[in-house]
Amino acid sequence: MIPTEDIIPIVKNTIAASIKFNTHRGYIGWSSCDNICMDMHDCLDMCTETLEMCGYMTALEAATYILVSGVKLASHADSSSGMLTDVIMYTYALIEKCTKEIEKQDKQMRDQALALIIKEAKKSVFDGWIDWRYDLLKCGICLCDEKSAKKLEKGLDTLLENSREDYFPEYTEKEDLIVSYLLHRHLYGKKNTQKELYQNIALNELRIIAIKDAMEDKNYDEAEKLCLEKANAEETWHYHSSDPEDWNNMLYDIYKIANNTEKQIAQAKKLLLMGNEKFWDVLKQIYNECGAWNENYESLLDELKDSKRTVCYRSILISENEKKRLLEDVMENPYDLFYYGKYLVKEYPEQVYELCYKEISESCAQAKDRREYKKITKNIAQLIKWKGNDTAKSLIEELKQRYPRKPALLDELEKVEKKL
């Protein structure tokens, strides 16, 4: 175990050395950025161990240093791999753990931790990263009492005033309103700050809080109203199926918790037809419970087909072993034929071979270089694996005759012909 007093120097030296080693001619490429991120992860692991050993302030100070270093890196390194974002999110989670532990300690430590967070959040490194700046300040809210809250409010006022010169000051204004509300809610409670919450209900983050409050109070009509106002206003392409706080996903949760089966079915069907295939199983379960699955099965598949959510529709056809429907859909639209063909070739070999012949012929007419020719012959090789040797042989002969002046294509065709 590393002594607590050594953690911060080790973290600072590790990150500095890693940045220096991975900087080449003043530039940090994506692989070098990932190397630095791995070193940062090691530092975060040290911080976690320190936190577990009750070194609360040391862990917090080291974690905020890692955060600031990560934000700096985001401004000038190639962080396209996504690893840096993961490090930063992990760091926020660790900072929050630190402040939750410090919240239980004496006032002196709480005030010290709050002062550290405010000081770090004011740094110019967060200019241009407004959400990250205010995410850090949110971590400090749990440390506030009415007296120390004035320091946080003063810091918020300073940041808001400085933002007047920004190109988009409204971003800072929005974050300021959110943090201010969360601070007031922490100090005065949910009921005493409800008016402030509804005054700023246009902000998505605060609307979500209001919805969750309404659900907690079993006021499902209010939760539904707040959710519908946004869900009905947005286009379907805004839908984020994997986001639990997407308005449409939240609306389904409201109906489920309220035990409103009719609205649950309607919303689940809506989400399915928007391409969220997990709601197929949801609908199956609900319909089975009321003995109505068989009578709704075919019509539900028809609606899904008409929705033009091809990937979702075909995925469900595969899971339900609906080979005939899948073949019909692939024949109408040979999109990703060589993926879906493996599910069809056993029962419908001739139809699949014919589709492959046509698809490869059309692709070859558009191909212009060896890279594209390789893709074509890869598909021919797949056709051979599916025991479509006669079709593959005829196709190769036709392509040779049709394109005698494409030596690169002829070369690739000769290679795949050897597999026959």
Protein language model regions, located:
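Eukaryote-biased, non-catalytic alpha-solenoid scaffold regions
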Residues: 2-420
